[in-house]
Each structure stands twice: as structure tokens, then as C-alpha cells.
Amino acid sequence: DLDIVQITFRFWYLLATDIHRALEQGNPAALPFRDVFEQLFAVILRHLRFPDDDTDLTGQERDDFRSFRHYMGDTLKDCCYVLGAEACLARSLEVIESALAQASPELRWQDMEAPLFSMRSMGGQVDVTTSEVVPRVFALVPRLPPHPRLRYAGLLVMSRYTEWVADHPEHLSGILTFITTGFDGSDRDIAAAAAQAMDFLCQDCREHLVPYFDQLMHFFRSVHATLAVDDLLSVSEALAHVVTAMPPAAATEALVQLAQPLLENVHEVCELPSATKPDLMRAADRMEQLA
């Protein structure tokens, strides 16, 4: 009963705080509780799993479950507090690696999406500068089966660990390619996840992405007319982050390039003999990007 599960969340938070303090003080009485939190971690992964068939869920039930998963993500952080974030991240990764190795016909996307969600939830706890697991995460995500829910979850995982890419720029090209392919299809959720990942990547790796600006602009010109408003804003902000890492003269020229496609859209609407409401809304959206 998920309603009962939620009642325990504060208990686990308080217990994790006390156990963490005791472990830091070298109290041997706290050691057995590590096993308890390892069991808790496994239970949470099971509860994070979407039902095999969620088509029978009402919209409210689906929203409630998503909200519940985010609360469960907070309890995962309690597990990190006791077991260590690196160890917890490795556990989630091993679940997916094991599933991929078996390649069973009975394997469902839900079996891999739940540990992916847990990786995303734990992102703020992991020291990406020293992690030995994060490189394995970035190697794994592009190898996931091409299911839209896994693609969506994988992009959001990448968006949580872009600080690692800043310390390992040799991986930047492959990661950038993976993120940009998230805009190729018609799935709005995947495009939104790709836009978020692009924003975080450009924010954390702005200096390394300066040589890629022409490539980024080519990509921007190819997608800006089809993106949803919020996604266009995220991608515009992403490229603006890169511009801030340029010398003043180069930044001025780059800003002109970035603004040009948006200004062209506004100009097209202004030239219409009788602009419709959607036309005016599109022009207003482009002006918001410019602001």
C-alpha cells in the first residue's frame, strides 16, 4: 500500500541522519543498520517501477504515482547518506547492466526505467569529480533499447551529471551528438528532456563548447521553428551560456548569429498582410527568446 509507504519517509530520514552521525563517530553499533538501508534501497527500486500496464490508470492515479516517485527519490538520498552515494549509484547501474546482459524477451522497459530514475534522483549526492561510476553511466545510456520512455529517462540522467563532462571534455562530442538526436523525432517529452540536457550541458561545459558553436548554431537553425516554446527557451539559453565564455568580439558576432533566426521569424509575421492570432503568438514567443 503506497499510502502506508509514504508514512515511513520521515522515519527513514531521521534514522539515516542518526546512523550517518554514528558511523562518522566510529560507533560499531551503527554498522548493522547498513544492511537495513541496503534492503531499503532494493525495496525502493521495486516501488519506483511503473506497472507493466499503466493504461488502466486514471490521469489522477498516474500523477499521484509520479509524485510518489519523487518522494521516494528523497528516501534514496537517505540511503546515500548511510551507504554512500557512489555505492548506491553503482547498485542502480548494475541492475541495468544485468538486465541488458540477459537480453531476455521478457525484459520490459519498466525494469530499466526505475533504476534510471533512481540515478537521476541521486545526482545531487554524487561527487562527479571523483566518481568511478559516472563514466559507466555515460557509457551505458546510449546503449539502452530504443524505447521512448528509456530515451526520455536516459536524457534526464545525463542532465544531472553534466559536471562530470566538464572535467572529462574528451567525451563531449559523443554526448552532444546523443543529446541532439533527442530532437529528431516527434515525441514532445523526449524533446523536452533533450532541451533540459542541452541547457545543463552548455551551462556546465560552456568553455569546452566554444569550438562547437558553429555546430550548435547549425543545429539551432534546424530545430528552432519546430520546438515547443519552453524547449526553444531552454535551447536558446543553452547557446547563450556558450556565448558568455567567448571573448567580447567573438561573443558579439555569436549573439547576432543566435538572434538572427528569431528575428527572421518576427519579421515574417510583420510582413503578413493579416496576421492571425497564432502568428502573433509565435512572434511574441520569439521576442521572449530574444529577451
Question: Could you say what each language-model-derived stretch is?
Answer:
Residues D1-A291:
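Karyopherin-beta/Importin-beta family HEAT-repeat alpha-solenoid scaffold
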